[in-house]
Amino acid sequence: MIKNRKKKSYTSVYALGQYISMSAHKARRVIDQIRGRSYEEALMILELMPYRGCYPIFKLVYSAAANASHNKGFKETNLVISKAEVNQGNTVKKLKPRARGRSFPIKRSTCHITIVVEDISFYQQYEEYLRYLKNPGCSNENRNLTCYDTYSSGGPWDKK
């Protein structure tokens, strides 16, 4: 059996909540609203949504940001929720006593929630570095030249 090993990422941090007493379907309804949003925007959305599942997800997003700032020194203003997934957990089965000595089964579903946040400031610096590598001597003023501008600028091809 071949296992895919996770590559070590220098820009992402995660928080994992296991055995949260909520159905996976109800948690996904909340998670879909915050996926891809910035950290501050996600906290505002979670505070204002009227669902019971918002509070554990709010705590996980807050924990992921705390992990990012403490463990890797990221700023919270640059964090974006890059990945948020909900997996189904165990089902806790109980018996509810009823009348005349009978009992009814109760199934309590749980879920596992993973929140991954990334620091986007590294991507912006990386894009600037790639632009510099493509045109190291070219400044911003020379990038908007057309073919006609290069030939009619008084170079050797402009002479008759």
UniProtKB/Swiss-Prot annotation:
Could you tell me the Gene Ontology terms of the biological process aspect for this record?
translation
Compartments in which it is found: Plastid, Chloroplast
What sections of the sequence does the record tag as coiled-coil? Answer: none
Q: Which GO terms describe its molecular function?
A: rRNA binding; structural constituent of ribosome
Keywords assigned by UniProt, alphabetized: Chloroplast, Plastid, Ribonucleoprotein, Ribosomal protein, RNA-binding, rRNA-binding
The answer, when asked if Magnesium is one of the entry's keywords, is: no
List, alphabetically, the GO terms of the cellular component aspect. chloroplast; large ribosomal subunit
- Entry keyword Disulfide bond: no
- Which Pfam families does this entry report, sorted A to Z? Ribosomal_L22
Q: Which CDD domains match?
A: Ribosomal_L22
Q: Where is the signal peptide?
A: none
Could you say which protein family the record assigns here? Belongs to the universal ribosomal protein uL22 family.
State the oligomer form and interacting partners. Part of the 50S ribosomal subunit.
Q: Which HAMAP family match?
A: Ribosomal_uL22_B (MF_01331_B)
Q: What is this protein called?
A: Large ribosomal subunit protein uL22c
Recorded source organism is: Lepidium virginicum (Virginia pepperweed)
Whichever gene encodes this chain, its name is: rpl22
